Amino acid sequence: MPTTLNTATHAGAASSSDPLQILQQVFGYTAFRGEQAAVVQQVVDGGDALVLMPTGGGKSLCYQVPAIARHRAGQGVTLVVSPLIALMHDQVGALDEAGVVSAFLNSSLEGDEARRVERELMAGRLVLLYAAPERILTPRFLAMLDSLHERGLFSLLAIDEAHCVSQWGHDFREEYLGLSQLHERFPDVPRIALTATADDHTRGDIIARLALTEARLFISSFDRPNIRYTIVEKDEAKRQLLRFLRDEHEGDAGIVYCQSRKKVEDTASWLAGEGLNALPYHAGLDAAMRRRHQDRFLREEGVVMVATIAFGMGIDKPDVRFVAHLDLPKNIEGYYQETGRGGRDGQPADAWMAYGLADVVNQRRMIDESEAGEEFKRLQRGKLEALLALAEAHDCRRVRLLTYFGEHSQACGNCDNCLQPPAVWDATDAARKALSCIYRCHQASGFSFGSGHLIDVLRGKLTDKVAQRGHDKLTTFGIGADIAEQQWRGVLRQLVALGHVLVEGEYNTLALADSARAVLRGEVPVLLRVASEAPRKTSRSRGSRSGTGGGRDKPPSLPLDEAGLARFAALKTWRAEVARAHNLPAYVVFHDATLAQMAREAPNDLDSLGGISGVGAKKLEAYGQALLGVLAQD
């Protein structure tokens, strides 16, 4: 991976410091989107900014364009704080392709190469330098920044994944806490902090810990309209996942999240045995294997990465067509961040999750057993409750999700609940039976029991344990025989989610919450979702992806005729060859959307090719003639 690059530019790309001209000439886009223009101007003018923008919303341009503008104005280098080596590699590779002099400093560089990058930095030739916080805060690196600052060559500090500084957030990283030192040391250097998600607590923590009290706050819509949200009741979760992948995403790239390393290994192996191109990823694998698997995911088509949440942050792959969860995340922020890794190219993607009572039990137990203070536990319980409300919702998932982030919207018409509203039943009587059973079993034995035993009592199943405890003599024995075991599991799960039942101790026993009294007295009605016995069919206004090869050869955006499809296929073949030669993911060369526009419009000269969105001056110079040759083929 090159860390610095040729500074030659296309004749049309004058060294303008105007942000819009930079956007057009360097990156090949005609206009800024949403809040981008206001953010860029704030930073170009030397102000601080805190940017909350969803994944795929164009956060990188919010600091890359100002970095180029300020460098061209003689103000020096932009330092980008990034937590992941993979992200640094891909960002520098993409900037290289666009003709922007940039580099990274991390443990992947040999000593000679690292020293060469440092010389480029100190000479003022770099526009952007990417580094991790732990490297930036070393005495050696701070001394280099001191030297740059004294010469007026420390232009801007960009802090990516800023939520990592917050202990209230879903991905706290202790090394981020030291970044406030940079503002104390260089108070006149403007800063931009960026994150894809942050609730009020996390947002306040970012502002406090990074001393961004004077920063202008930019909040874009959290809506990802191209993502369809589906949450199903767990029943043989791996089989449910396989059915989802085969029915909807055969041949597509995607991510499957699991909570434990063992489950990652087991699921990846099982999916591979079922014929899918599935790979495991978790922190327990050695670094070389993690890097190999990540590179395959980024560079190959149709790879399914089965991973813990150690995977995903900073992954810029635009054509991830699905994100699946086999376990419940910790909170809505984590769910939003993880599902947001799908559909970065703006094309349709699925967020699919299987969820059951054991998920609720496990998450509650982890909170209760953590060594955190009671205030932190209380906040985490509240966040989990919000996620459970989303999982059990009868109405639009998107409305629920956006409401959590303080944004109001209309029903999307595209989530599972909108496409097929769930059946709801009056479960007041069943809930009272379940709560009474929990109470009677505890009263008889002096301690609580788990869901399996309680269901046996409710259904009148005389197991050894039921007989030993004398629970077959209770008035609640057999009072729920008319309800199937799976439905009782749904009742108990939803009572836990509603807060009427508590999960206690290392054995995950169930106990009554204070709110259960009102239900038992018949003062509060209980409406629950009907337990699903078969996969719910949902129709797509956007069309199915089923069938061999799935969506991998399907061009995005507007449909192409037969000739256009042939051009698109030829362009993808050409792009793959270039990507291999440059050791880059294919999307760094050109996104699918750019190739699709080329295939549709079939430009026959450099000027018209340069008008395609995503074709900047450097790429036009480097690839223009070759692309025209591909497009001219019959």
For each of these PLM feature ranges, what is it?
Residues 116, 205, 266, 292, ...:
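Short, solvent-exposed alpha-helical surface patches in well-structured domains
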Residues 375-405:
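Short, charged low-complexity linear segments at domain edges
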Residues 40, 64, 305-307, 311, ...:
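Alpha-helical structural signal
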Residues 1-22, 42, 380-381, 408-634:
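Accessory DNA-binding and partner-docking regions appended to nucleic-acid-acting proteins
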Residues 10-26, 30-34, 38-50, 54-60, ...:
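Helicase motor core with emphasis on the C-terminal RecA-like subdomain
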